[in-house]
């Protein structure tokens, strides 16, 4: 089971503390969002997990191995994208990734296969022999993510992977990250975009002023800090009748209220945890109203986030 763990991880620059006694253990194949405002310590943490900077004290462990004393062993199963590198515009994805594969120590007889597989994962196989200089920012970012996947890692560390992208590029990268979750990987992704974390991640760790505030599943975090209730948004294939919302959905067990956001989107407030959320989804599917997506509402995470961040000021 892949794991990353911070044990009393601290980084000081003179009198300034960038990270303070961070204790965080993440295990299993899932996507965890590392959420916090700019300057909160997110990038500092990721850089210590990749040995780009040394901690003042504490340990950064990957699969139980100390990154700073056994770097090669610890990072052997890790792919990283920290501070997005610029790929030479004259290179093709194939050329750039082949060089990275060589640097990573991938045997020469395996490089071609790994390059093709990594580009396929980010849906860039059609551009394998095109010059990077002609790519959009989103396409370049997908190639950079492919570079993190070149060794087929069990753990992927991403530092704000959608920063600087237009809405289309952001959506493309988020969809790629979602697809990576289904391939038995642990993804630890920093972000300051609440809707992104809500859409992509299974769990969230919130940090501010170098200190961890909370780490749990999204439903548990929103329930714990928003009065014990959870909110889900449901997208439908076709418009739903008001009577169905009022009678069939609002009357389901543990549902506090159900209302239409618009003709094809619903907001449902319910009490309970993941087990209730699972049952609620099954109950709604049985109504045969054309459900096409079901997710925690980002507005609830925003409310919790602002409440927690304000409390640390």
Region annotations inferred by a language model:
Residues 2-6, 11-189, 194-214:
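ABC transporter nucleotide-binding domains
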Residues 18, 196, 241, 276, ...:
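Short phosphate-engaging motifs
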Residues 28, 126, 236-238, 272, ...:
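Non-catalytic surface loops within mature trypsin-like serine protease
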Residues 174-267, 271:
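ABC transporter nucleotide-binding domain
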């Amino acid at each position: 089971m892949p794991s990353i763990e911070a044990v009393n991880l601290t980084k000081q620059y003179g009198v300034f503390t960038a990270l303070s006694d961070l204790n965080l253990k993440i295990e299993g194949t899932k996507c965890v969002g590392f959420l916090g405002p700019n300057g909160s310590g997110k990038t500092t943490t990721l850089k210590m997990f990749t040995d780009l900077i040394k901690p003042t004290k504490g340990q950064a462990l990957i699969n139980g191995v100390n990154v700073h004393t056994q770097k090669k062993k610890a990072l052997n199963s890790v792919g990283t994208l920290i501070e997005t590198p610029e790929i030479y515009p004259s290179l093709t994805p194939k050329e750039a990734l082949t060089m990275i594969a060589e640097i990573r120590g991938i045997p020469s007889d395996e490089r071609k296969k790994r390059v093709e597989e990594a580009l396929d994962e980010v849906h860039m196989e059609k551009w394998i022999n095109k010059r990077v200089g002609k790519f959009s920012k989103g396409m370049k970012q997908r190639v950079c993510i492919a570079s993190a996947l070149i060794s087929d890692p069990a753990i992927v560390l991403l530092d704000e992977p959608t920063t600087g992208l237009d809405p289309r590029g952001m959506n493309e990268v988020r969809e790629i990250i979602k697809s990576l979750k289904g391939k038995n990987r642990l993804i630890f992704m920093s972000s300051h975009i609440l809707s992104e974390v809500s859409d992509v991640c299974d769990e969230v760790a919130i940090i501010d002023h170098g200190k961890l505030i909370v780490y749990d599943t999204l439903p548990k975090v929103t329930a714990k800090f928003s009065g014990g209730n959870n909110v889900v948004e449901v997208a439908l294939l076709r418009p739903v009748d008001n009577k169905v919302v009022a009678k069939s959905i609002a009357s389901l067990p543990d549902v506090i209220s159900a209302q239409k956001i618009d003709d094809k989107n619903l907001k449902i407030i319910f009490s309970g945890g993941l087990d209730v959320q699972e049952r609620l989804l099954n109950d709604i599917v049985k109504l045969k109203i054309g459900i096409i997506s079901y997710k925690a509402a980002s507005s609830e995470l925003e409310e919790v986030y602002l409440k927690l961040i304000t409390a640390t000021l």
